[in-house]
A protein has these predicted regions:
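Bacterial N-terminal signal peptides
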Residues: 1-9
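Hydrophobic single-pass membrane-insertion segments
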Residues: 11-13
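Eukaryotic scaffold repeat domains enriched in small/polar residues
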Residues: 15-339
Length: 339
């Protein structure tokens, strides 16, 4: 059973204890329960800080972590299958799997985005190792990667460059958009990116606490604010947007209009609680997998029957079309921790 979400956020730059936010609302508690000790790690292995997680077409789960093996495959029952990509990674960050079951990693230590086949062989390198953004096609601590319906590659070049970079399916640079800032089309740490079936690009503008939505050419369409801190985004087959909120340590489901449909989770160290909910993935049976950074673990949450309970007090989403919101972005903390 999940406890109600706390009013006090588990985030250094968020609302102070005792502060009140008139936008807070109660929403349905999503029907998920934690599956304790789902992953059976090899003897002697501790995950360390966890970062990325993804699921392939067979339901196998791939975990990206900051201890060896940094990239590992587990079957649908949580049993270890193999380690992959030994020696390829510096500081693992994001992990995605494309329609052909290729693995894509973002590494904010080496400034690289890698495409690997299911056996861990390198197929494509974007960026240049240990080189920041000296050219349009280079990155400065890239955070996440996503794919368009025609194979386009979108990189959230997050920690250093505050932009989105677009490549064609073969890795040729096409364009980029965004810069550091608070306005429309600007970012304060674009930490995650996802693309829906219509080609719209969703960017989790983490420290501005919003999701900005663009067309495939980077033209601004709208934004959703008041949703917390978007650390990771996943778009489900029904086109709902799922978000890890690493500031309040919860999982949120939104519809295509930006309405919050439900949430679950809370900050803490017990099973089912989280400390920096980073990235997430959804399995074919609707199990949700979460990289729980500071707890040094990956957690699995199984879907259950609806409970009818409410997950109390999360920010209400507000959608803006083509204009900036009238909220105090300038008051936000701008020192960005690497997480």
């Amino acid at each position: 059973m999940f406890a109600c979400l706390a009013l006090v956020p588990f985030h250094a730059g968020a609302q102070p204890t005792g502060a009140k936010d008139s936008s807070l609302q109660a929403v349905p508690e999503l029907p998920y329960r934690v599956v304790p000790n789902f992953f059976k790690f090899p003897k002697g292995m501790t995950p360390g800080e966890t970062s990325g997680v993804a699921v392939n077409s067979k339901g196998h789960i791939f975990l990206f972590q900051r201890t060896r093996p940094m990239l590992a495959e587990y079957d649908q029952n949580g049993n270890f299958v193999q380690g992959l990509g030994e020696g390829l990674f510096s500081h693992p960050h994001g992990l995605r799997i494309d329609a052909d079951d290729n693995l894509w990693t973002t590494d904010d230590g080496s400034h690289l985005v890698l495409k690997l086949d299911p056996s861990g062989n390198v197929l494509l390198v974007l960026g240049r190792i240990n080189t920041g953004a000296e050219a349009d096609w280079l990155f400065n601590k890239p955070a996440d990667v996503a794919f368009g319906k025609n194979g386009e590659i979108y990189v959230a070049d997050g920690y250093g460059n505050s932009r989105v970079v677009k490549f064609d399916r073969n890795g040729n640079y096409l364009k980029s958009w965004g810069k550091y800032g608070l306005g429309i089309g600007e970012f304060n740490l674009p930490h995650t990116v996802a693309v829906d079936r219509d080609g719209r690009v969703y960017v989790g503008d983490r420290e501005n606490q919003r999701i900005q939505i663009f067309d495939s050419e980077g033209n601004f369409l709208r934004q959703w604010t008041g949703i917390g801190y978007p650390y990771g985004l996943v778009i489900s087959p029904d086109q709902h947007v799922w978000m890890t909120d690493g500031g309040y340590d919860r999982i949120i489901e939104l519809d295509q209009e930006g309405k919050i449909l439900g949430a679950f989770g809370e900050p803490g160290h017990q099973p089912g609680q989280m400390a920096w909910a980073h990235f997430m993935a959804i399995g074919p049976d609707q199990t949700i997998y979460v990289a729980d950074v500071l707890n040094w673990r990956f957690q699995a949450f199984a879907r259950t029957a609806p409970t009818g309970r409410m997950a109390k007090y999360i920010p209400s989403a507000r959608m803006f079309w083509g204009s900036a919101p009238s909220v105090g972005w300038a008051s936000r903390q701008t020192v960005i921790p690497f997480k």
